[in-house]
Regions:
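Structural core segment of the AMP-binding/adenylate-forming
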Residues: 1-3, 106-179
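AMP-dependent adenylate-forming
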Residues: 8-18, 35-60
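Conserved pre-ATP/AMP-binding loop-to-beta segment of ANL
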Residues: 47, 181-205, 212, 235-241
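Conserved AMP-binding/adenylate-forming core of the ANL superfamily
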Residues: 48-102, 119-124, 177, 220
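Conserved AMP-binding A3 loop
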Residues: 59-63, 201-227
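Conserved ATP-dependent adenylate/AMP-binding module captured primarily in the ANL superfamily
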Residues: 116-148, 226-243, 273-286
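Conserved AMP-binding/adenylation subdomain of ANL enzymes
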Residues: 224-241, 248-329
Length: 329
């Protein structure tokens, strides 16, 4: 991991800034994971996350999410994880991804993240390059695509399957949660807080299309800066519906999600296949997106428009031409 390129930290909002007063509590944290107890007290029964299209279709309130993060962090501790350890997390968006991510941070551990569609050689490189001591996979299918399974079984402290299914020696999600619940009942506490804002929180890897993937460590300071300063762009109220479609293992989507959670929003997970249906279902007030997504929607709209009767085409084109952009003051 010696060749990692660190992203510089950024300055906090000035204290006299109009957004700073709303973010003053967040501004005092030195670790991303510390926001959850604060959010639990502030937003409690408000739904934090709702997985619309995942296999388990789970949803959790802020209280439930905070409690699960604590239990999961105790599970990681039980399996021998300590501050500074790296765990590779290979999964797409889901509440379980988020819980594992924040449970790792609670211990001061670091996650190296990637999506499930990456080639096996790339995933194995990330596990090795990051010096990971543990592995979390979305499903047994992700585990089965890896070539060095026997070597990983011997070397890693644990291999966790985020699904309920039992498979080989993988620790399934219910079993992992059960360990945390037992540790929680023992009043098992964490060691003295030695967290620091410059601790590495996560390692993001490039796609590797032009060579080996390159790892970029992001610190808690990097993420906290986004959580505080994204208020310049969006200022949602608690309970606001947010539709999340971009991969959570990308820095942009991840920072945006942390920010929306910090505002008490309700985030709905979808995927590109169901985006059209879920926009109608959720009626989101805000989304974190990229131009390519809207270009695809734009092209799809005009393709459908061409198939409509001429009179309807003219009417819709008139409405588009005379529409205006809404801008927030």
């Amino acid at each position: 991991m010696n060749d990692l390129a660190y992203w510089p930290g950024a300055k906090s909002l000035p204290k006299n800034d109009k957004f700073a007063s709303k973010r003053k509590d967040i501004n005092n944290f030195d670790h991303v994971d510390k926001i959850w107890e604060y959010l639990k007290l502030k937003y409690g029964d408000t739904i934090a996350v709702n997985d619309l299209r995942g296999k388990n279709k789970e949803k959790f309130s802020y209280s439930e999410l905070a409690n699960l993060i604590t239990k999961v962090s105790l599970s990681f501790k039980y399996y021998g994880l300590v501050k500074g350890d790296v765990v590779t997390l290979i999964s797409e968006n889901s509440p379980r991804w988020l819980i594992a991510d924040q449970g790792l941070m609670r211990l001061g551990a670091i996650n190296a993240v990637r999506g499930v569609n990456s080639p096996s050689v790339e995933l194995e490189y990330i596990i090795e390059h990051s010096n990971s001591v543990g592995l979390i996979v979305q499903s047994k299918d992700v585990w089965l695509k890896l070539n060095k399974k026997d070597e990983l079984k011997k070397r890693l402290k644990f291999i966790i399957n985020l699904e309920d299914e039992e498979f080989e020696n993988l620790i399934n999600w219910p079993e992992f949660i059960k360990v945390g619940e037992k540790e929680y009942l023992k009043n098992n506490s964490f060691e003295k807080d030695i967290s620091h804002i410059n601790d590495v929180a996560s390692i993001l890897y490039t796609s590797g299309t032009t060579g080996k993937p390159k790892g970029v460590p992001l610190t808690h300071k990097n993420f906290l800066h986004q959580i505080i300063n994204l208020a310049y762009i969006a200022d949602p109220t608690p309970g606001t519906s947010v539709l999340s479609v971009l991969p959570i293992w990308h820095s942009y989507e991840r920072s945006a999600e942390y920010f929306f959670f910090s505002c008490g929003c309700t985030q709905f997970y979808t995927n590109p296949k169901f985006l059209k249906d879920d926009i109608k279902l959720v009626k989101p007030v805000v989304m974190a997106t990229v131009p390519r997504l809207w270009e695809a929607i734009h092209d799809g709209f005009y393709l459908a428009l061409k198939k409509m009767p001429p009179k309807k085409q003219r009417f819709l084109k008139f409405l588009i031409k005379n529409s205006s952009v809404f801008k927030r003051n």
